[in-house]
């Protein structure tokens, strides 16, 4: 048997709700393609809730086989610093897993550094820029995209989310 079309929305809703909680660290699942190939239908026992639950169970069974990864937000960064602190700032960006894309002299003994960096590494960046430049530097940071989290950090993120989930429950 096949699934009647009037139950397709229930299947989709079950899958969407399941995607809100990913298998690795509990973060929402994105960029998922799912296809409903077949299913069974019984005139008495089939209900929207049954198909919604079936979709959720299929997600939980199938997603680990798809080799999911954790994505992290990457920001586009422009930092204006005095020329004499440019090297220190480049080192700081490298420590924060940043990738320097270019540098430009912007006059008045100032340099603008263009870079991309994980947003998670930029929490205290405003304080650092003020300290490093004695208040004469500034920066802009805007979300750019999501990139795969390096595998060396994945275990720590998963452990942290499990610990946090344990504290909440």
Regions found by a protein language model. Give the residues of each.
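Accessory interaction regions appended to the cores of large information-processing enzymes
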Residues: 1-169
